[in-house]
């Protein structure tokens, strides 16, 4: 990342994985109550921010299928500007590297990186808790990325406790299909009554001194998605005889954990030709964590 008084370049918006995802109920407001552990990855979109003196917020790169006015990065910048009364504007460039609609948190991570970067570039010095309260207005996953640590999440994903996780490498395979989250949540067959667990339950099996994430829990959305999207089911089936694997979020990405980069790349080399995949290392902290206190 390059940090000057007028710009911030090569800001990573990291991907996330849901190491497990349990749906424990439905809230009075209609949202589903969730429990999950979010894992940051050293892989994601790259964002570039350049100050404008005219106060305008502008996205200067085209993102296919995402109009500028509805882009979460533009909404995040505009929300922060209005909240803080900032007089400066910004040009935002986005180098999209994460597949969209894949359960990796791409758009939400872009929004969080925007909040953190502009907190520094606009010299707002807002505390992290304030940025998180703004993040909630942008989407359920955005507060986690502002929180900036691997986390045990509850509620709709906004109640977060930091967790220490063992370092590892992941192979992430993304079928070329878009899975609509809202449609999966509305499916009658979706499990909505998983027994709530505690952070202690998780850490006993999967903490920094314990085992691997695939040994704990499940993704309650996975059976619904694999029943409707043969492409996702095919990836899960491919992994079956090699190593435990799991879908992240509402899909479509499927991941497996490995102890080394070499092990992950060896598995990647066995993938069928044409499959979209990436090998990524775990991260313990968001690269812009220091941009809020």
From Swiss-Prot:
NCBIfam families: ispE, PRK14608.1. It is an enzyme of class 2 (transferase). ATP binds at residues 99-109. The lineage of its organism: Bacteria, Pseudomonadati, Pseudomonadota, Betaproteobacteria, Burkholderiales. The active site is at 16, 141. InterPro entries: GHMP_kinase_C_dom (IPR013750), GHMP_kinase_C_sf (IPR036554), GHMP_kinase_N_dom (IPR006204), IspE (IPR004424), Ribosomal_Su5_D2-typ_SF (IPR020568), Ribsml_uS5_D2-typ_fold_subgr (IPR014721). GO terms for biological process: isopentenyl diphosphate biosynthetic process, methylerythritol 4-phosphate pathway; terpenoid biosynthetic process. Catalyzes the phosphorylation of the position 2 hydroxy group of 4-diphosphocytidyl-2C-methyl-D-erythritol. Its EC number is 2.7.1.148. GO terms for molecular function: 4-(cytidine 5'-diphospho)-2-C-methyl-D-erythritol kinase activity; ATP binding. Belongs to the GHMP kinase family. IspE subfamily. This is 4-diphosphocytidyl-2-C-methyl-D-erythritol kinase. Keywords: ATP-binding, Isoprene biosynthesis, Kinase, Nucleotide-binding, Transferase.
């Amino acid at each position: 990342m390059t940090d000057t008084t007028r710009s911030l370049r090569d800001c990573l918006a990291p991907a996330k994985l849901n190491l497990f995802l349990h749906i424990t109920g439905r809230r009075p407001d209609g949202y589903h109550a969730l429990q999950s552990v979010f894992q940051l990855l050293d892989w994601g979109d790259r964002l570039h921010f350049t100050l404008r003196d005219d106060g305008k917020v502008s996205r200067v790169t085209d993102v296919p299928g995402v109009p500028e006015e509805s882009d979460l990065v533009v909404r995040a910048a505009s929300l922060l500007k209005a909240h803080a009364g900032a007089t400066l504007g910004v040009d935002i460039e986005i180098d999209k590297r994460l597949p969209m609609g894949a359960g990796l948190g791409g758009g939400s991570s872009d929004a969080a990186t925007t909040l953190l970067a502009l907190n520094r570039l606009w010299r707002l010095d807002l505390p992290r808790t304030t940025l998180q309260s703004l993040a909630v207005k942008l989407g359920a996953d955005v507060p986690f990325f502002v929180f900036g640590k691997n986390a045990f999440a509850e509620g709709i994903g906004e109640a977060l406790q930091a967790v220490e996780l063992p370092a590892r490498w992941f192979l992430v395979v993304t079928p070329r299909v878009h899975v609509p989250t809202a449609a999966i949540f509305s499916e009658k067959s979706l499990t909505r009554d998983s027994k709530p667990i505690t952070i202690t339950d998780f850490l006993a099996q999967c903490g920094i001194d314990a085992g691997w994430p695939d040994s704990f829990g499940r993704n309650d959305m996975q059976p619904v998605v694999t029943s409707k999207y043969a492409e996702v089911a095919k990836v899960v089936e491919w992994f079956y005889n090699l190593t435990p694997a799991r879908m992240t979020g509402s899909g479509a990405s499927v991941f497996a954990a490995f102890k080394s980069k070499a092990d992950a790349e060896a598995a990647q080399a066995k993938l069928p030709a044409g499959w979209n995949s990436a090998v990524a290392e775990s991260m313990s902290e968001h690269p812009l964590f220091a941009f809020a206190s």
